[in-house]
Amino acid sequence: MKMKLAVLPGDGIGPEVMDAAIRVLKTVLDNDGHEAVFENALIGGAAIDEAGTPLPEETLDICRRSDAILLGAVGGPKWDHNPASLRPEKGLLGLRKEMGLFANLRPVKAYATLLNASPLKRERVENVDLVIVRELTGGLYFGRPSERRGPGENEVVDTLAYTREEIERIIEKAFQLAQIRRKKLASVDKANVLESSRMWREIAEETAKKYPDVELSHMLVDSTSMQLIANPGQFDVIVTENMFGDILSDEASVITGSLGMLPSASLRSDRFGMYEPVHGSAPDIAGQGKANPLGTVLSAALMLRYSFGLEKEAAAIEKAVDDVLQDGYCTGDLQVANGKVVSTIELTDRLIEKLNNSAARPRIFQ
């Protein structure tokens, strides 16, 4: 298989973790006879400094002619006092909109070697393997009007707006994902209060008729936020609207014990997607070899799975990550029992060693 990838390293530790992910990707693709062309582009603060905008047209052109996007991280205090239109995060929001990325997938998986790093009790997190599917392009964050009004601007209004099509496509995506996992889907809303949530629930029920093998349940967002802490292992796939998903996915991120481990995918209706780690740009450790590359590496694995259907290669990367952690190798943000803290580059070297060793083993059963 041949693929063309847009590579957007971004700011802070973004270039370091992106280098790691590209090295791992090249290894697993070469081992299995696939070919990738990588084309770098600017986004965020780096783009502001060089091109005067967080999302240059050249970057959009590169992304449009690519099969998928890999992104490192955007932002940092250097640009905090810029006008709103010149903030690094505007580049990310603009890219999502321009590329039609409406579904954010946030996998949350507990690793045996990191259970003690979780703020939750070991027995509550050891079997956690869930995905939060968040709608990205509608809801309160994009509704109009959104303004201050009245005398002295002492009244404020934000608008929560969704179309039927926007709700249908995100719920459809969640059912498709649940169907290839454990066939359980929790649709999260606030249907006891919000009209938008009542429509959301109606559409979920309509869509469920097409997926009789998937068990659909409805949960209120306040109950879900409690259950994510009390019993996270009950969840398989969670689907929800934009703001609820923003909050719940950040809450769920603490389960693993490190933001540095978490990948994410932003998808549209076809196989195209943008893949990035959940963590920020961490400018305080940029260039010091301390950055944890695993969230970006695991994001690359998601890319192979969802954009290219390369399940075997994606699983190989995920197994290499697990094996390296089992061997005790980690960066400083990870609390691995009897762990050996190594640099970004050395941790990447260990991953590549695992992948090459696995590829070199004779395959008795084909």
Swiss-Prot record:
Top-level class of the enzyme under EC nomenclature: oxidoreductase
Site entry: Important for catalysis: 141, 190
InterPro entries noted in UniProt: IsoCit/isopropylmalate_DH_CS, IsoPropMal-DH-like_dom, Isopropylmalate_DH
Pathway: Amino-acid biosynthesis; L-leucine biosynthesis; L-leucine from 3-methyl-2-oxobutanoate: step 3/4
Zinc-finger among keywords: no
BP-aspect Gene Ontology terms: L-leucine biosynthetic process
Cellular-component GO terms for this entry: cytosol
UniProt keyword annotations, A-Z: Amino-acid biosynthesis, Branched-chain amino acid biosynthesis, Cytoplasm, Leucine biosynthesis, Magnesium, Manganese, Metal-binding, NAD, Oxidoreductase
Domain of life: Bacteria
Name recorded for this polypeptide: 3-isopropylmalate dehydrogenase
Binding site for Mg(2+): 222, 246, 250
Residues bound to NAD(+): 76-89, 280-292
Entry binding sites for substrate: 96, 106, 134, 222
Reaction catalyzed: (2R,3S)-3-isopropylmalate + NAD(+) = 4-methyl-2-oxopentanoate + CO2 + NADH
Subunit structure: Homodimer.
Alphabetized SUPFAM superfamilies for the sequence: Isocitrate/Isopropylmalate dehydrogenase-like
GO molecular function annotations of the record: 3-isopropylmalate dehydrogenase activity; magnesium ion binding; NAD binding
EC number, as in UniProt: 1.1.1.85
Cofactor binding description: Binds 1 Mg(2+) or Mn(2+) ion per subunit.
PANTHER family in the record: 3-ISOPROPYLMALATE DEHYDROGENASE
Subcellular location: Cytoplasm
Family according to the record: Belongs to the isocitrate and isopropylmalate dehydrogenases family. LeuB type 1 subfamily.
Role played: Catalyzes the oxidation of 3-carboxy-2-hydroxy-4-methylpentanoate (3-isopropylmalate) to 3-carboxy-4-methyl-2-oxopentanoate. The product decarboxylates to 4-methyl-2 oxopentanoate.
